[in-house]
Each structure stands twice: as C-alpha cells, then as structure tokens.
C-alpha cells in the first residue's frame, strides 16, 4: 500500500513548524496499530547533502537562478533518498515545506518566472505531488511581529515586508488553483482552534 505525502507551507512566522510536530505525533498514534510509520522531514534539507545545501541557501547570497537550481537539486536528492522510498514502503511523509515554497519564495517573492520553476518541477519531481498541502496563512506584519527577537534571522526571514506580501500572494494563488490539494488554515487564530481543524483533517485522510 502506498503511503501519503503531507506538506506544511506558509511564510516565516506563520507557526507551521509548531503545528507540524503536533500533527505528526497524532498521526503516528493512528498509524502505529497498522505497522506504518511517519517520516518527518524538511526542505531545504532532509538528506545529508540537502542539509549542507540548506546552510548555503539560508545564509549565502547568490544569483536568483542559482538559488532556484540549488533548491531543486536538494529536492531531487530528497525525493530519491527519503520521500519516494518511504511512500513505496507504505509509510506517510510529512515535510516542512516542499515545491510550493519555491514557487512562493523564488517565484512570488523574488520574481523568478513561474514557467522556469514549472519546468524544473516537472523534471525533478516526475509527477510526484503532495496528497495534501496545509497552508498556514498569516498577514506578513503579524508573522514579522512573531519572529521579532526570536533568533538571528536567516536571509529569507530578513527580507522586506513587501517580499512577504508577494510570497503570501503566490501561496494563495496556488491554493486557489488547486483546491483539492490545499487546505488553507487561518494561522492568526488560537492554537487550540487550529488544532481542531487539524484533527478534522486527520480524520478525513
């Protein structure tokens, strides 16, 4: 039996990583009686090579196209070494970001042509798409307030407010274009209210 692939998306500060950890725990409890596992991973990263590329991508300045190509290089390794093998075993994969983040950040935020990203997506993913994508939607000014003084920001977190306005807009455009895959979650609400939504989603999967 093939597993399912769930991705968590949203701009920095939307709280997706916190909710991902809780969601994964709940899913593990549901799948354990079936002898199935939950693989929790992230992008950029997810493999030894991917984690090294993550450090480069998050902290070094580079040409726009170089950044996108490194994102997809890391993703190809991630798919081949982690995601595809897990799905073929019947396990479930939960990833903190996937290709939608590249469209949102490099496409929406940085302005790279969407057509170029689509070509890379087809080549690298070979048809692989998430079963469900949970988009934690939050106004950029609220997200920025949450991140303030939290830690030393990486190069993306340090981007301008307008960068995140464009990034959020591209996320929402993609969600509107694929309503069967995306679940948009209002991340401005209280944690318990968001978890109720996640519980409903778990029951439907």
UniProtKB/Swiss-Prot annotation:
Keywords: ATP-binding, Kinase, Nucleotide biosynthesis, Nucleotide-binding, Transferase. The keyword Transferase applies. GO terms for molecular function: ATP binding; dTMP kinase activity. It is an enzyme of class 2 (transferase). Gene3D superfamilies: P-loop containing nucleotide triphosphate hydrolases (3.40.50.300). It comes from the Bacteria. ATP binds at residues 10-17. It catalyses: dTMP + ATP = dTDP + ADP. GO terms for biological process: dTDP biosynthetic process; dTTP biosynthetic process; dUDP biosynthetic process. Its EC number is 2.7.4.9. SUPFAM superfamilies: P-loop containing nucleoside triphosphate hydrolases. The keyword ATP-binding applies. One of its GO terms (cellular component) is cytosol. Phosphorylation of dTMP to form dTDP in both de novo and salvage pathways of dTTP synthesis. Belongs to the thymidylate kinase family. HAMAP family: Thymidylate_kinase. This is Thymidylate kinase. It comes from Ralstonia nicotianae (strain ATCC BAA-1114 / GMI1000) (Ralstonia solanacearum).
